[in-house]
Amino acid sequence: MGKSLTRKIIESHFVSGDMTPGKEIFIKVDQTLTHDINAVMTYLAFEAIGLDRVRTECSVSYLDHNLLYVDNKTPDDHIYLQSAAKKFGVYVSRPGNGICHTVHVSRFGVPGKVSMGGDSHTPHGGAIGMLCIGVGGMDVATAMTGVPMRLTMPRVVRVNLTGKLRPGCNSKEVILEMLRRVTIKGGLGNVYEYVGPAVAEMEIPARATIANMGAEMGATTSIFPADAQVKRFLAAQGRPEAYTELLPDEDAEYDETIDINLSELEPLIACPHQPDNVMPLHQAEKKRVQQVFIGSCTNASYADIAKAALVFKGHHVNEDVSCTCAVSSKQVYRQLMRDGYVEMLLDAGVRLLEIACGPCCAIGQTPATDGVAVRTSNRNFKGRAGNPTAKIYLVSPESAAATAIVGTFATAEDIMGENVKILDSIHEPDQYDIDDSMILPPLSPEEAAKVEIVRGPNIKFLPVPEPPQETLDAPISFKARDNVSTDDITPASAEFSSMRSNIPLMSQYCYHRYDPEFAARAKEMGQSVIIGGENYGQGSSREHAAINPMYLGVKAVIAKSIARIHKGNLVNHGVIPMLFEDGADYDRLEQTDELHIDNLREQIAARRVQITDKTKGFSFWVKLELTDKEIEVVLNGGQLRTLKKQLEAEKEA
């Protein structure tokens, strides 16, 4: 049998391990990316490691998420990150240049390369045939040292796309349909490889929408072939030399196949409070909408915004709706201005925001109390937009524009009728507006050596956990429901995002929106354990959702299941991720129960731990679904201690 594209790339970067699905492998990393909200921890870790310069082909620091300067904290972070990038040989994409994933695939993406990003939507780059994986910041710091990436060998799922989207539909419909079928945890351990006749007609930003939101299924990543569409895209970006054709073999072997006929899709909507709560838009209960946001890394390409503008043409935003738009990059913004689409948006009453992630991660445009917001972004968790009482619905840009006009859920066809066919005439440019003046290239080693890293008062130390002891006595400090997200653990918004380089401050708000007493309670307990339901830690890659509990004394998370990136972050920061052997034990445990474990280190190594509930007088078993390397990291007290040992051993060898 032939090979999938995924397997070809993994084989070309393979360092060691067992390429059987579910087994541990180590692969070479070519590129890394970080963004401003999470990157401070990454660069603090890299500083602590002690290397003078990154050892990747290309590392980029994007200042793109929080551009709202309400006090000193965020500008402190940006100045620190820019100075650290200069010191360590890293590119900087300055504020206003664009959202990390859009800029990276446009200006740095190379088919066949492996990229690690400190953001869960890093798989965006799979649109051009890269293997792009979202991880926590400590894993990015590790990759920047040149140490191979630790990965569980994925299953590869073939997604066969046939047919053609009807006018007024968007590739957003494809990924929403995938979420409807696969669910928010069904993609765990999988790479989704998109093939089929419909793929050949799909432009790169449309593919990126699908690859980007594969993260919502819990997937390791998603990938498309590097074909004629990729060749056209890279030529339009003025980088034709970056193109290499990369295709799966015709007889490629896959672990599973999913078939989707695009002709059968209609406009879809993801209802609160999970992105897999998907139904046809016309079947959704009509709600009066107060806010519409068109933007985010998922759906703010040239074609996305141009099509939304054409839906608005001749119409105006409903008087009861606040409609905003954030374009994905300066490059796309200038192109839209040149072609008249920005004027169409302004004429319709759309408010244009700064080029940034912004509202997607609750930095501005928080909905009203009990408000209904329709967005083209990727997540609709409770509180994701900054207000836990709001209800967030996810749709395509075409449907978002129609909804803004009507004031309730609507499609482009509802507004345009037969003229909706005009939308099919919109394509990505044959030549993009190239201006890299807001990308700062790495300094030479000689110049970098002269750079002093600038630390404002908001830049605090990176906490480093101690290795686990032989005995653990710890109460339960928090019992979580199913599908707790990293937003629940560490809130988004401009206020909270600006605290993320200051763990002593940020930790005070751990679980703040759902249990305001948690931080004080956990700190008073000294050491404690968190109990979780299914899919604990889904969503964003923010490692603060592991660091903050660790700083407050949390030693372990015991859950029914744990999301991939969050499990890795727990391991990296010395919190032991444990899974119930019998899910019924979850119901027997209560907050503040006192737990006891003997011979903890020995049991960790055996991957099976017996825990006694001293309060209720019973024992139960948990398992550790960790690789050999992850067990080593846990026993060492986290990745930073492990990496330092490894690099010191290399020096002595």
Question: What is each PLM-predicted segment?
Answer:
Residues 1-653:
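Fe-S-dependent hydro-lyases/dehydratases of central metabolism
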